[in-house]
Amino acid sequence: TTESLDMVIKGMNWEQGDEAVYAQQDYGAMQMMFEQVSKRYGTVNRIVSVPNHPSSDEEIVSLYQNAITSKTKLLMVCHMINITGQILPIKKICQMAHDKGVQVMVDGAHCVGHFQFSIDDLGCDYYGSSLHKWLAVPLGTGMLYVNDKHIDSLWPIFAEHHKEPG
């Protein structure tokens, strides 16, 4: 999950003053990648704190909505928070963020194979997951979903080599 989501964060075309939104409860390595991007490009990280016992989905959606500004480029949200096991209202968060022109990247490290859902139904732009946790595949196996409309705008962080035939 970390490597796949790092590819998105590092692959975006960041400019000074761009903003990212994420939560205190997000995985530490993801927070550190946003810190690296901030140091390198002068971006701003807006950090929210998800309550352990929210009164409704709307409380969580509002939390993220209130952190978004006209400079917000990417919102990262955990599908399931690893500390508490909370499953967040991803579809509602994506709809809200998209209404504001913000892309959404979902950390789904604990979800694929744990419970049933459809990435298409969530409406996110990016979804990364660790597959070894619930699918009994080798440690380190993961996946990254990128919505078709964003593929061409992500910079590859690994070079590839194509040798011409002949």
Residue ranges and their predicted role:
Residues V44, S55-G108, W134:
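Active-site phosphate-binding strand-loop segment of PLP-dependent enzymes
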Residues Y41-P51:
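Short beta-strand elements in bilobed, periplasmic/extracellular small-molecule ligand-binding domains
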Residues T1-Q16, G28-Q31:
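Conserved beta-loop-alpha segment that forms the PLP phosphate-binding cup at the N-terminus of a helix
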Residues A23-M32, S49-E58:
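Gly/Ser-rich phosphate-binding catalytic loop and adjacent alpha/beta segment
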Residues L122-G166:
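Active-site PLP attachment segment
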Residues V21, R46, M105-D107, G128, ...:
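Structural detector of well-ordered beta-strand residues that form the stable sheet scaffold
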